[in-house]
Amino acid sequence: MIPRIVVVLLSVLAVVTARRSYEGYKVYGIVPESPDEAEILYQIRQSNPDLDFWHLTKQPGDEARVLVAPKDQRSFLIKLIRHGLHYQEVISDVEGTLAPYNEPRTRGMSLDRDVSTSYLRHNEINEYLQTLSQKYPSLVSVEEAGTSYEGRSIKTITINKKPGNAVVFLDAGIHAREWIAPATALYAIEQLVEHSSENQEVLSNLTWVIMPVVNPDGYEFSHETDRFWRKTRKPTGKTCKGTDGNRNFDYHWGEVGASTQACADTFRGETAFSEPETRAVRDAVMKLKGSCKFYLSLHSYGNYILYPWGWTSKLPETWEAIDEVAQAGAEAIKQSTGSRYTVGSSTNVLYAAAGGSDDWAFAVAEVPISITMELPGGGNGGFNPPPSSIEKIVNESWVGIKAMALKVAQMF
């Protein structure tokens, strides 16, 4: 008989060895000095799906960051040099930066404390929601909005459900590796539920429906196996897995900025709403059609508050109302912490990316204020703020979320 301790050690070893290694990977920073150079970078991204662009905008002077595998580094640098693009090596040892995140999280703390000090796993998040529904039954209810491809429960929490209230729908975690987004959603839940008396101005006339993890399969995979996994986990071919959930919504689906290559990080999916995860968002929002006045999707990273359209540089007819809400969030954060957020339409600030959730919510679900908030980055690369940074980021983000919700409450 194999001693139990040996079995445990072998199990731990199996988990450790299953992790994807980023040994030899580097992250490069490139600052385009003109719109033409920014366009060159965009074209490099479009024609090289193996390059993982962590950050890329149209704005000259805004540093792009690219994760590059050892096999691609020489050819990538040749491209940059050929086009006269200046670069620097931002992270020379990507694997080395991941060690703190591969260590087991210390248990024994209460979940409410964990919300702003560590990244909860999906089962812990659902446990937290359930605990709140039991502790505050008159304020909170929890429902299953859907089931992921691998069978995980996708839950929503409804806070302060009252007839006639305008509804705020907030989601996070469409992209697996953006851990700070679910952490921020959880902090918003904590503030609205456990500190409700301090947040009555955004509770008295508003009902909140929050889906803290849209893509639980990818989220768990990014914790257990591949820290920088972005997509869902449903197979999309013989060798590839996953779809970019934020290219999978059925509004101008499959158009500009959405890849047809199944292995690409921006793969649009085999059809619109091919993923059970995006269907869960669709169904939850459509149930609220008419009463939902504010759709907010949390992403990272990059200090942006963005709104439609993502498929064209044209603006919606009612863009000024959306911009007013977005500007309220940006100004509140600036006044509170000094951090500056860029506000504008997705295509004009970043790049065109059709099939996004905010475009769909605005055009199809008819939510009048539809916004994507790109949260601050952290750590060496951007996607990996250390646990010590969570509290600062979620506090700052809540200031902006609360200000936007207050503006919506005043409008509707």
Swiss-Prot record:
Secretion signal span: 1-18
Tissue spec. comment: Expressed in midgut (at protein level).
Cofactor(s) required, per the database record: Zn(2+)
Enzyme active site: E374
Induction behaviour: Up-regulated in the midgut 24 hours after a blood meal.
Residues annotated as binding a peptide: H175, A176, R177, E178, R230, N246, R247, S300, Y301, Y351
Reaction(s) this enzyme catalyzes, per UniProt: Preferential release of a C-terminal lysine or arginine amino acid
Transmembrane parts of this sequence: none
Protein's GO biological process: proteolysis
PROSITE patterns membership: PEPTIDASE_M14
EC category name: hydrolase
Domain Peptidase M14: 118-408
Effect of D358E: Abolishes cleavage of C-terminal arginine residue, whereas cleavage of C-terminal lysine residue is not affected. Cleavage of C-terminal arginine residue is restored
Propeptide span(s): 19-75
S-S bonds: C240-C263
InterPro entries xref list: M14A-like_propep (IPR036990), M14A_act_pep (IPR003146), Peptidase_M14 (IPR000834)
UniProt record similarity statement: Belongs to the peptidase M14 family.
SUBUNIT field: Monomer. Interacts with Dengue virus type 2 (DENV2, MY89-88549 strain) envelope protein E. Interacts with Dengue virus envelope protein E type 3, type 2, type 4 and type 1 with decreasing strength.
Function: Carboxypeptidase that preferentially hydrolyzes arginine and lysine residues at the C-terminus. During infection by dengue virus, may play a role in preventing viral packaging, maturation, and release from the midgut.
The protein's name in its UniProt record: Carboxypeptidase B1
Annotated source species: Aedes aegypti (Yellowfever mosquito)
Gene from which this protein is expressed: CPB1
